[in-house]
A protein has these predicted regions:
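A conserved beta-strand element that flanks and buttresses the S-adenosyl-L-methionine
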Residues: 114
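Basic phosphate/pyrophosphate-binding loop/patch that engages nucleotide-derived ligands
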Residues: 137
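Class I (Rossmann-like) S-adenosyl-L-methionine-dependent methyltransferase catalytic domain
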Residues: 1-105, 126, 133, 141-272
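Short catalytic micro-motifs in class I SAM-dependent methyltransferases
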Residues: 117-121
Length: 272
């Protein structure tokens, strides 16, 4: 299904930040365990490395760095959700409200960045490419970045991921997905929780831990996702000339890529 780009952009700008502000409390309560692959990356960095957590959510990686006594410089942290940032500050960390496509940091200064479960919320190929370029611009030559996104394929080597194992599902072959009308016009497929993805662009409902979450309309608790096909993240990275792919792995239903900023030659602007 091909969706209108204006509709997808509307979902990013007008809907997604409101959703995370609405569900911030129950979302934060459910996000406490860091991904092992992200922690391996952070632990591999030299002492004193300075980096950014882009789309920091409730700050769980800021907490993990502190709890593991990693000798990194204090991380820059940002997110689009004001209420999630309240949770970050409540944990004793500084963070700013910022969009991935308009980060408030100077370019070429950081040793690393992590961007976990953020890029898959950007609703067009161009916005996803621009997001990677935005992060790449922050790195100094030789700097590293980790980008993690949700995978469309929730089976790996014949086994279901924990996401699917947490629910019961039947074969989705031949299933016609329900479509949800969204403000601004148009419709987008509604993905049933804990079932295999049958489209790459979907709305996913939030199963609120706190049943008292108030919502003004049906869409207010639905998050837009673009789930990545095999090789899709690598293909995007290949379009950013200043980056080279170091590693790409599949971890429990996610694609995770580590990239390196190519050292610029003398007089070269290497941020594209």
């Amino acid at each position: 299904m091909i969706l209108d780009e204006d509709l997808l952009t509307f979902l990013n700008i007008s809907i997604l930040p409101q959703v995370y502000d609405t569900i911030a409390g129950s979302f934060s309560d459910s996000r406490y365990a860091p991904w092992p692959g992200v922690m391996r990356f952070l632990k591999s960095l030299p002492p004193g490395s300075w980096g950014a957590d882009i789309g920091c959510g409730n700050g769980k990686y800021l907490v993990a760095v502190a709890q593991n006594n990693l000798l990194l410089s204090p991380l820059l942290a940002s997110d689009t959700s004001i209420r999630l940032l309240d949770h970050v500050r409540g944990r004793g960390f500084d963070a700013v409200a910022a969009n991935l496509l308009a980060l408030p940091y100077r370019s070429g200064l950081l040793d690393f960045f992590i961007c976990v479960a953020v890029l898959h919320h950007l609703a067009t190929p161009q916005r996803r490419l621009d997001g990677i370029k935005s992060m790449a611009s922050l790195l100094k030559g030789g700097g590293l970045g980790l980008i993690q996104v949700w995978a469309k394929d929730q089976h790996w080597k014949g086994k279901s991921t924990m996401y699917l194992k947490s629910g019961k599902f039947e074969s989705t072959e031949g299933v016609v997905m329900e479509e949800v009308a969204v403000p601004g016009g148009g419709k987008i497929p509604l993905q049933k929780l804990r079932t295999p993805f049958v489209a790459t662009d979907v709305l996913l409902p939030w199963n609120a831990v706190n049943k008292k979450v108030e919502t003004p309309n049906k869409v207010a608790l639905m998050r837009y996702y673009h789930v990545f096909e095999t090789g899709e993240l690598e293909n995007l990275i290949a379009q950013v000339s200043c980056l080279e792919l170091v590693e790409s792995v599949y971890e429990q239903g996610n694609w995770s890529a580590i990239v390196r900023k190519i050292e610029p030659t003398l007089g070269e602007n290497n941020n594209e």
